Amino acid sequence: MTTSSIKRRRSPHDARASNDGDGLQQEENDYETDSNGTRVLATDAIDVNGVTITANLGKRDSEEDSWASKGYSYINPFVHRIQIDSHIDVAKIYVLSVLLLPIRVVGCVLSLLSAWMFAYIGLYGVSLEQLQAKPITGWRRCFQYLTARAMRMVYTSGSFHYINFKGTPATPKEAPILVVAPHSSYVDSIFVVSGHPPSIVAKRETADIPLLGRIINYAQPIYVQREDPNSRQTTIRQIVDRTRSNDNWQQVVIFAEGTCTNRTALIKFKPGAFYPGVPVQPVLLRYPNKYDTFTWTWDGPGVLRLLWLTMTQFYNRCEVEYLPVYTPSPAEVADANLYAHNVREVMAKALNVPTSDYSFEDVIVMSRAREMKIPFPGDIVEIEHTLDSLGLFDSKRDMELCDSFLSLSNTDTVDIITFAELLQVDLQNPELHKLFALLNHRHKGTVSLKSFLLCSLFCKLKNCDIITFLRSLIKLYSPSSQQIERQNFVRLLRHAGGKLNEQKAQALFFALDVDNVGHISFDAFAQYTEKQTSYKFLYHKSEHIRRPKTNAAKTTTVTSN
């Protein structure tokens, strides 16, 4: 086929629609004709120092603001939605918002103040260094218990009246570390205050939080100093020292996943809890409630909405199950990752959920994709795995398609047959159909070529600096890198992250277009920003973001209907 035109064809995915021109029609609607007969973007304009700058470009790439595709069904542990379909339950929420919510808020505040008061008394005359050196004893330990009881009342006031305990808790000598999963919410800390408070691992900044900081200090946490380049090793050493100490330290609680998930699968455990090589006790958290109004994930409701919905239920339940102590084998003592993997398998089996190849690092990738306006950031990791399976990471086909993109037609409505031809991949390859389904968010049997190219180039270049990524996208927006018009320049800079909004991008264009010729070169843009300290973020490499390994284990999937 030629590269000058993409012809629509009937395909197995075209059952529900034969044509989808939403994106192209939007492109046309975003232009209007000025007094000189020139087509320009229809926008609202503001005047800055005598220069007219549009405040809001109407044009949006149709899929850049879509967080996750619904075209392919698989387990994504970082996406959560609340579905309340009953009109009675909705009415109950609004009624309790008036009648019960204010009382609960007052109860939470009073309980929190009581906990702070007990912590203040218990910490009187004790420095933070002393708290880190030796476990507290005597009357201070009694006040520590009272602080935990007061914090438990915070949750009771907030609707968590019941905690059902299963299994037998181990003593600190039997299992110095408690490995807790799944970690899905701020509510998970209810486990920490449900009895004699164990130690936690927390950021050093939490010690300075008003009210809560003093309460957290009283739990004698292991603080992580993020500004310290040796923070990881220091934290591991502190955990090892406590677990092997002869002092009467309380157990250390570690949420091994390292981030919140939706409990549909257990993601990779971080190995920090397993480096000491001591026995651990796995602890499971469950929330057997009608509605899940407290799961707080990367893509889901915000914390205020979750608090509101949680506190407007009559009550919520939490279930804590202590599994038998897991004693590591010599091989597991020598390999913390193997130890973490095997403990995760035991916990997943007890929870009756699968394990997933997702990890905390994937949240970093998805967050970066969202900042850079990449389509479907919630699916970008799965898209990345699929591209790797198709062998497209080592291919330059996406760059070739970028170079000819503006000369192609119907790029917003590419069917599966054309998609296979463009990528030069066998139409029968199941990974191709998976990739197509991930991009087919409209369920109309077509995908956007631009969305694919943005995703593909992001996955390949996510470790590079932003300026390199932007350079690779030029041909998606402008025929030439030497003559980039203002509207195309602004669209291109949408992918520079959240620090460059439309007004800043347009102001930057006018600063570069000193001769008022109506276009600039990308090289001029790069040279200008490289000298300005305010644009250093464009040249920062994200080397901590991992690349998938060929033949690596893929994320758990479920069959799509």
Regions found by a protein language model. Give the residues of each.
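Primarily EF-hand calcium-binding motifs
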Residues: 389-413, 417-424, 429-457, 467-486, ...
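Catalytic core of membrane glycerolipid acyltransferases/transacylases, capturing the structured
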Residues: 116-150, 156-158, 171-229
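Conserved, structured regulatory domains from eukaryotic proteins
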Residues: 203, 211-237, 244, 286-315, ...
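Structured partner-binding subdomains within large eukaryotic complex subunits
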Residues: 281, 315, 344-351, 518-555, ...
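Extended, low-complexity, polar regulatory segments
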Residues: 2-88
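A cross-family acyltransferase "interaction/gating" segment
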Residues: 210-218, 248-251, 258, 262-341, ...
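Alpha-helical recognition domains of nuclear gene-regulatory proteins
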Residues: 97-98, 153, 178, 215, ...
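Membrane-interface recognition of transmembrane alpha-helix starts
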Residues: 79-115
